[in-house]
């Protein structure tokens, strides 16, 4: 399945925001200042994907979701099914090409907000992605991605409410992706027992060890009852929990994504191409990631989207970021900007030359669009030094510069090579 259109009305700090996806599979980036509402958007999408029944497991205070002083707020997703998506119970999908997931928040009084599905006579969403039929793949990940350190009370949700568990970490920072490591260790036992499922470990190692994924030629070495071990760029062997924050952030996401794909589609469908040495997982679905750039070096930010879209070519990735480098992979996708708090501008899709600068331009071209705020490139001190360099250049041009000033001018030129 894919999200074709999404809209929010009076949700948290957002009065109105709408996204459309003409070509859903690909890399779709949401940018905006701190406090603009990026996390609110991706959480709203995740809430609508799991549905009102599963969402009760969040134990959320629904009054926090409705914008202050508003009587009603809505989240609406228009879902396009894929051939892999099956109905819950008896019946056929019929002529429905678009399925509507719509949630409504209604203020009862100052302290109470009612949360429910917005009724539609055209469909019963519990037969579609809110149901238990196979397919309908979606997951969501928050910015605090790690293997350990979460609240253990949430662990049982992954088993009792697997659909909610697949989206859980986007709703709070106290959720760790511990299930991914436990799953890998269990797969190792299947290897020892020479069971067919044990081949999954070989396929996962192939995928993670592709040359364009981990920096500095780091490699996944071994998965055993003792845990998951990597070899870093210096040749040292390290347990996965001792890797850097950036490594753990991306690896926990990747392992958990694969685990969820296997849960929904099964081993054979997930790895049938990799088993033939075609290194892709071509299944459809929606993957939401808040702050994909968290803890990543700029060089990794630049290529992370290209890696995910290369090896998961039919997934719709919706990610938030503060980095223009993450937008490099949006040649197959879209870029959206939430307006800054207090601004009169409208939130919108970034198109045309502005989009091209973010995808193809250098980092200064990207910041030059001012889509990431006004003049974030240099500090005030740097600006004053540039002005000083300009004055010294004028003196040099007219031959009125002293030796000390010329020495200062050369020093400033070395500092600001890209500006002179």
Regions found by a protein language model. Name each.
Residues 342, 352-420:
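Acidic, Mg2+-coordinating catalytic modules of nucleic-acid enzymes
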Residues 162-283, 403, 419:
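Extended helical coiled-coil dimerization/tether regions that scaffold
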Residues 48, 183, 187, 260, ...:
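Solvent-exposed, amphipathic alpha-helical segments
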Residues 1-59, 222, 226-371, 376-377:
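Switch/communication elements of ASCE P-loop NTPase nucleotide-binding domains
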Residues 1-176, 195-196, 331, 387, ...:
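P-loop NTPase switch/coupling surface
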Residues 68-76, 273-289, 391-396:
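Short, mixed-charge aromatic SLiMs
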Residues 153, 221-222, 380-384:
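Short coil/turn segments at secondary-structure boundaries
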Residues 44, 140, 203-211, 307, ...:
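Amphipathic alpha-helical segments that form well-ordered structural scaffolds
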């Amino acid at each position: 399945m894919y999200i074709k259109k999404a809209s929010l009305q009076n949700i948290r700090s957002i009065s109105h925001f709408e996204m459309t996806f003409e070509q859903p599979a690909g890399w779709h980036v949401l940018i905006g200042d701190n406090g603009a509402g990026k996390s609110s958007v991706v959480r709203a999408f995740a809430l609508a994907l799991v549905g009102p029944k599963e969402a009760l497991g969040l134990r959320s205070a629904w009054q926090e979701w409705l914008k202050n002083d508003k009587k009603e707020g809505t989240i609406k997703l228009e879902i396009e099914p894929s051939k892999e998506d099956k109905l819950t119970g008896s019946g056929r999908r019929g002529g429905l090409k678009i399925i509507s997931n719509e949630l409504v928040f209604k203020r009862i009084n100052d302290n109470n907000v009612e949360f429910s599905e917005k009724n539609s006579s055209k469909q019963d969403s519990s037969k579609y992605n809110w149901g238990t039929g196979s397919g309908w793949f979606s997951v969501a990940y928050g910015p605090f991605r790690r293997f350990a350190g979460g609240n253990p009370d949430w662990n049982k949700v992954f088993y009792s409410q697997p659909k909610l568990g697949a989206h859980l970490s986007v709703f709070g920072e106290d959720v760790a992706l511990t299930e991914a490591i436990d799953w890998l260790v269990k797969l190792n036992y299947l290897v020892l027992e020479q069971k067919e499922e044990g081949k999954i470990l070989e396929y996962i190692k192939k995928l993670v060890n592709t040359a364009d994924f981990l920096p500095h030629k780091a490699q996944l070495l071994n998965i055993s009852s003792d845990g998951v071990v990597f070899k870093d760029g210096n040749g040292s062997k390290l347990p996965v929990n001792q890797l850097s924050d950036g490594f753990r952030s991306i690896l926990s996401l990747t392992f958990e994504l694969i685990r969820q794909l296997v849960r929904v589609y099964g081993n054979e469908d997930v790895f049938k191409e990799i088993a033939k040495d075609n290194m892709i997982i071509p299944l459809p679905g929606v993957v939401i990631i808040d702050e994909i750039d968290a803890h990543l070096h700029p060089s990794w930010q630049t290529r992370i989207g290209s890696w995910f879209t290369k090896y998961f070519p039919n997934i719709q990735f919706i990610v938030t970021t503060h980095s223009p480098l993450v937008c490099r992979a949006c040649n197959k996708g879209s870029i959206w900007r939430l307006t800054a708090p207090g601004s009169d501008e409208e939130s919108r899709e970034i198109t045309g030359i502005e989009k091209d600068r973010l995808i193809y331009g250098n980092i200064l071209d990207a910041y030059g669009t001012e889509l990431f705020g006004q003049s974030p490139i240099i500090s005030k001190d740097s600006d004053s030094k540039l002005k000083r360099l300009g004055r010294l250049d004028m003196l040099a041009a007219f031959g009125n510069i002293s030796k000390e000033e010329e020495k200062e001018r050369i020093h400033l030129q070395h500092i600001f090579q890209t500006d002179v």
